[in-house]
Amino acid sequence: LDPESIKKQFDINALSPLCMTRSLINLFNKKSKIAFITSRMGSIDDNTSGSSYGYRMSKVALSMAAKSLSIDLIKKEIFVGILHPGLVSTRMTGFTNNGISTKESAKGLLERIDSLNESNSGKFLHANGETLPW
């Protein structure tokens, strides 16, 4: 374990998106949508492989911040997406053959963002539309 690396991941993946959103919040209008790209690796219920402590902890923290924001902002009719991009074939995943392309992931994420509304704001959603476990 490298505590400095974990702190850096937390700052980048959880704290920075929250701080940026709070700084910009007065610019959002009714029916605005805010998307947070988190990860299924931040799901406590779905963790079957362990490891990746810093990444997992930072992503679950981001999901919690986004969930809290969704509750705080619903009365202003601002909707919050908590989104997993899918297993994307990138350097981070070792360009896995099991992954989807960045284009396919982006398409799914945009569809989820477009469909954000009062009923699904604050839900943990996969780019393919599946609701994910916390």
Located regions from the model:
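Short beta-loop-alpha junction of Rossmann-like oxidoreductase domains
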Residues: 43-46, 84-96
